[in-house]
Regions:
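Bacterial N-terminal signal peptides
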Residues: 10-17
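A short tyrosine-centered beta-strand micro-motif
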Residues: 105-122
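Short amphipathic, basic-aromatic surface patches that mediate peripheral association
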Residues: 34-43, 57-63
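Short acidic/polar inter-strand loop motif in beta-rich domains
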Residues: 60-61, 117-134
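Short Trp-Ser/Thr-centered turn/loop motifs at beta-strand boundaries
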Residues: 78, 133-135, 140-141, 145-147, ...
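Bacterial Sec-dependent signal peptides at the C-terminal "C-region" and cleavage site
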Residues: 17-30
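N-terminal cap/lid segment of alpha/beta-hydrolase-fold proteins
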Residues: 158-197
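A beta-strand/beta-hairpin structural motif
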Residues: 81-102
Length: 197
């Protein structure tokens, strides 16, 4: 009986600790929102994909070129499905980010901000399921430079998560296709359809 009590009490304390942390996070709601959209001339049909907001204090390069796995700038993402041209996708404190978990954790100050949309493609699997994923377009699975994806102009903004503020970002720029290098005397490129695919 004492062994069970020794196991149950730490488990209950752990659950309470997690619950209290979640309540504190919920109480720290941010009034800051980012509204990301794209015009019809950039992408005329509804799209499924992931919308990103990227933030930096460094004006030397576009925020999208400062995103890194380690020591990168803060950015947040939100999945969208059937997003129409001109329709806004809202990125708020519920959107998951890295290295800052939520936009409510942004220190007040001046930043350069950019919106980005990673357009997904539909894949019908042999088991009958359909999945939406990023389609490689010869960019090496780097969605930040993948043809067809869209990005906004960089805006300089003053941000204070404690103040009510909606920053609108219009992704009107489309990343162009990657051109294949020309054939040479020694290198020829061919395409063929696999019978298995």
């Amino acid at each position: 009986m004492k062994k069970k009590a020794r196991l149950i009490i730490p488990m209950i304390l752990g659950i309470l600790w997690i619950f209290i942390g979640e309540v504190q996070t919920m109480q720290k709601n941010s009034l800051l929102k980012f509204a990301v959209q794209f015009p019809a001339d950039a992408h005329p049909q509804p799209l499924t994909g992931r919308v990103y907001v990227m933030l930096t204090r460094n004006s030397q390069r576009e925020p999208r070129f400062q995103v890194r796995r380690a020591r990168g700038i803060p950015f947040w993402g939100q999945n969208v499905s059937g997003l129409n041209p001109g329709e806004q996708a809202v990125v708020d404190e519920k959107a998951f980010g890295f290295p800052l978990r939520s936009i409510s954790n942004i220190p007040a100050g001046e930043y350069y901000v950019q919106g980005f949309i990673n357009v997904y493609s539909e894949f019908k699997r042999s088991d009958g399921r359909t999945v939406w994923l990023h389609q490689d377009h010869w960019e090496g699975q780097n969605w930040l430079r993948s043809p067809g994806n869209m990005y906004s102009e960089v805006q300089k903004v003053r941000i204070d998560p404690a103040q009510k503020q909606t920053i609108e970002l219009v992704c009107s720029h489309v990343i162009p296709p990657i051109e294949s290098p020309p054939d040479t005397k020694w290198v020829k490129r061919i395409k063929f359809q696999s019978r298995l695919l």
